[in-house]
Amino acid sequence: MKQNIFKSIADLRFAIFILLVIAAFSVIGTVIEQDQSIETYKLNYPLTNRVFGFLSWDIILKFGLDHVYKTWWFITLILLFGISLLTCTLLQQFPSLKIARRCQFFRTTQQFCRLNISTNLKHLSFSQLLFKIKENNYSIFQQKNIIYCYKGLIGRIAPIIVHFSMIIILIGAIIGSLSGFKAQEIVPKTETFHIQNVLNNGQFTFIPKVSVRINDFWITYTKQTTITQFYSDLSILNIDGNEIDRQTIFVNSPAKYNGIDYYQTDWNIIGLRLRMQDSSIFQYPFINLPNTQEKLWLTWISTNQQLNDGLTILIDNLQGYCSVYNKVGKFIGNLELNESLKIENPITLIDILSSTGLQIKADPGILLIYLGFLFLMISTLISYITYSQIWIVQDKNKIFIGGNTTRATFEFELEFLKLIK
């Protein structure tokens, strides 16, 4: 009974069926936005106008379609697929490899009829034939007048490595799903933050109590004032606030520390500091203008104590200046850092306050996934090694010779013809 169950699990058709089910749910997880707020699903999948006539936000939440890859049933499918690969390896691949390593001698000439290519020779001596076979790097086994030869046995290991690598990838995916996390932080320059805004995490996720300080943030521009890259200089701090590591990150070049990756994703301008005529310093917040093709920030500052007159300041970059307009919208001029604006009550621009957007990710299973893909690439290369077999039986004055190969049949036939010439 148990043996039949294991044979069914090890069956290729069962593995393909499970793989198709996993692929189908993966498509669902791609189509339906993952790890979004309930309001997002209520907006996109309302009860009154169901998608495809049946799909609404309550069904999505009920069956966990908002976090497909972390549900118990999806992880169970992955485990079942892994068990199928493992049992197939143990019950089919290893026995097949053991058989391939055995000396499979032919005892009768009738056995040559089932080979892909075979013939009988009269003009070629037995020792001369063995010498040619040896020159072609075959391993030769002999019992009196019968010979068995093979080469490329390592090619038979490729399916085992494929299964092994896929199991490693599945284990890595499960570990990442259960214990990884993704967070996002918007942090002003010179501020220190802890990981708090977690977007998604697994059942066994541990959020480390690490402190990170944003030392600096800057943007590089082309001559046409378009952005080429933006950078964040950040420091990893210990519990005492002392720096233990410092790295500069930019887009597609994250900082890595203790299994956590810090990615540069966004930026913002949050305010500016101005020095007034009486040397007092004021900080004004910026408002990001929506529905604009390019990023644009705006603020208003009062120029008198009655708050009935003031200036509008616009900024769209971090190149160290902003544009100033009066109360009727007339352009007055650009105000640069440490420069004073000559008006009735002069003001000096001290600093433009910016913030950096970071995405923080941890995936403990990613190394296993990379390792699995490495073995998968190795198995692909190994699979190109052809496993070839040759049988020889000497019967009186005749030499019967035949062979089989797993792939590259044409090349094997050419090699075979050269052997019997």
Swiss-Prot record:
A GO CC term attached to the entry:
chloroplast thylakoid membrane
List the membrane topology term(s). Answer: Multi-pass membrane protein
Q: Does the keyword rRNA-binding apply?
A: no
- What are the UniProt keywords, alphabetically? Chloroplast, Cytochrome c-type biogenesis, Membrane, Plastid, Thylakoid, Transmembrane, Transmembrane helix
Q: Where in the cell is it found?
A: Plastid, Chloroplast thylakoid membrane
Protein family membership:
Belongs to the Ccs1/CcsB family.
Q: What is this protein called?
A: Cytochrome c biogenesis protein Ccs1
Which organism encodes this protein?
Thalassiosira pseudonana (Marine diatom)
